[in-house]
């Protein structure tokens, strides 16, 4: 993601808790995010009720499969890497369009 771009993320039920966070890495197959929680999901765990709020578009609701999770002492948050489960084609397009726009902006402002 480009510097300054915020992609809020929330998980409706992580061990009984609604968790908010922010994506720092995004692709059509998965996401890296910082979450405001001390709860530690396990590798392979499926999280449902996930909402990803891409700028200037409707919120994207999905499920995630945790690939890694660890406490990040520098940010005092939980850092996760996860893959999307069961994205619809329209959701994949939504993410791909957002990422393409990010790339266009990056090229426009840093045309190396």
Residue ranges and their predicted role:
Residues 1-28, 34-39, 96-112:
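N-terminal helix initiation/capping motif
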Residues 2, 26, 43-45, 57, ...:
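Short coil/turn motifs at beta-sheet boundaries
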Residues 4-13, 44-60:
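Short conserved beta-strand and strand-loop elements enriched in small hydrophobics
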Residues 21, 62-68:
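Short beta-strand-centered aromatic/proline hotspots
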Residues 26, 67-71, 87:
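Residue-level recognition of beta-strand microenvironments
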């Amino acid at each position: 993601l480009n510097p300054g771009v915020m992609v809020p993320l929330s998980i409706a039920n992580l061990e009984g808790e609604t968790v908010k966070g922010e994506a720092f890495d995004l692709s059509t197959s998965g996401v890296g995010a910082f979450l405001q929680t001390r709860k530690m999901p396990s590798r392979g765990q499926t999280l449902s009720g996930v909402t990803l709020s891409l700028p200037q578009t409707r919120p994207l609701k999905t499920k995630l499969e945790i690939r890694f999770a660890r406490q990040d002492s520098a940010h005092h948050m939980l850092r996760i890497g996860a893959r999307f489960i069961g994205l619809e084609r329209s959701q994949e397009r939504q993410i791909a369009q957002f990422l393409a726009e990010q790339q266009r902006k990056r090229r426009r402002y840093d045309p190396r």
